[in-house]
């Protein structure tokens, strides 16, 4: 009897796991397809937008306290856009009390200034604790109807989908892809798959709460 119950439990767990993996794969494909023609890696391909939305991260890794390449490359991308006159203002959105005690927007602001971006064109949003909040705040708090998202491509794809499916009054949102680190931990990919699955749940809950 116990063996039969155990077998049934294993089958149910296996089925649930397989269904979850399939669902995550489908979510990933939907996000990638939606971003086609809207994310750009070449500076000449990007259109002018007054504001660039720079998505926050910490300057040093949580483990090992090493320089965070994701941070460095996002700063470089934002500086490139500003110096190429593709944006006039940089809205830095992240957690003001991020991991390891870092204030993400302030850290990014300091790095942008060090790279020659004037302080007066940098706006901080310390309430961007998650990507979906950064997108919502850009529209609802800062009144932006269009902007250029700045992050790594996988992050941009998810942010674009959120921007277009939150029911916000947006037009002309695009994304500029920061360089991605050569050595990427596989956990980054796993986390992104999970984040894309969670994103659809977030969008559903946001829609329900908005009605």
What does each model-identified segment do?
Residues 29-189:
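A structural signal for short, hydrophobic/glycine-enriched beta-strand patches
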Residues 7, 24, 70, 185-188, ...:
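Residue-level recognition of hydrophobic positions within alpha-helical transmembrane segments
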Residues 2-44:
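N-terminal type II signal-anchor transmembrane helix
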Residues 186-209:
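A transmembrane-helix-recognition feature enriched in membrane-embedded lipid enzymes
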